UniProtKB/Swiss-Prot annotation:
Keyword annotations: Membrane, Transmembrane, Transmembrane helix
Protein name stated in the entry: Transmembrane protein 205
A GO CC annotation given for this chain: membrane
Superkingdom of this protein's organism: Eukaryota
Length: 189
């Protein structure tokens, strides 16, 4: 498109719906559903639910980032991009990259380690309790202290989980900043 040419109302609406939908989904999954499920479900049931939800969530995030990048990238000749447009494209590329890392690499590894942990826990009769409902000493801490394999798997799980959480927060922040930019560019409400 030439400099200043309007991309059309439909493209603008699609861009806004995909971006805001992705951001809303990310807020819900990151800050609401995970905490509610963690506090309400038995530990292994929570893990099973998350292992089903996260692949879909990460792939939808990836798809939304890809769609938004495809909508925005061809709108202007690259030489005519403003600082904000370059920033927005960079944020969407970051979101796409982080969502891809989560969807294609981290999720599978995190789930595999979680299943290995759950297997050991099941052998010890653990995993059916809702987190936070312990009476007496923490049986998971005792298991960590006694079983070096379990302890190593747990560290590996938290390593992958931590990286995945950082990628997810990066996507959330990137999309949020893009939405802020769009909101600041509104001429009226």
């Amino acid at each position: 498109m030439e400099k200043g040419e309007d991309p059309g109302s439909l493209i603008k609406v699609i861009h806004l719906l995909v971006l805001s939908g992705a951001w809303g989904m990310q807020v819900w999954v990151t800050f609401i559903s995970g905490f509610l499920l963690f506090r309400s479900l038995p530990r292994h049931t929570f893990g099973l639910v998350q292992s089903k939800v996260f692949p879909v969530y990460f792939h939808v995030s990836l798809g939304c980032a890809f769609i938004n990048l495809c909508i925005l990238a061809p709108q202007r000749a690259w030489i005519h991009l403003t600082l904000w447009e370059v920033s927005q494209l960079s944020l969407l590329l970051l979101s796409l990259t982080l969502a891809t890392i989560n969807a294609r690499w981290l999720e599978a590894r995190t789930t595999a380690v979680m299943r290995a942990l759950q297997s050991i826990e099941k052998e010890r009769g653990l995993g059916t309790e809702v987190p936070g409902n312990f009476q007496g000493p923490d049986p998971y801490r005792q298991l960590r202290d006694k079983d070096p394999k379990y302890s190593a798997l747990r560290r590996k799980f938290y390593h992958y989980h931590g990286l995945s959480s950082l990628c997810n927060l990066g996507c959330l922040l990137s999309n949020g900043l893009c939405l802020v930019g769009l909101a600041l560019g509104l001429r009226s409400l």
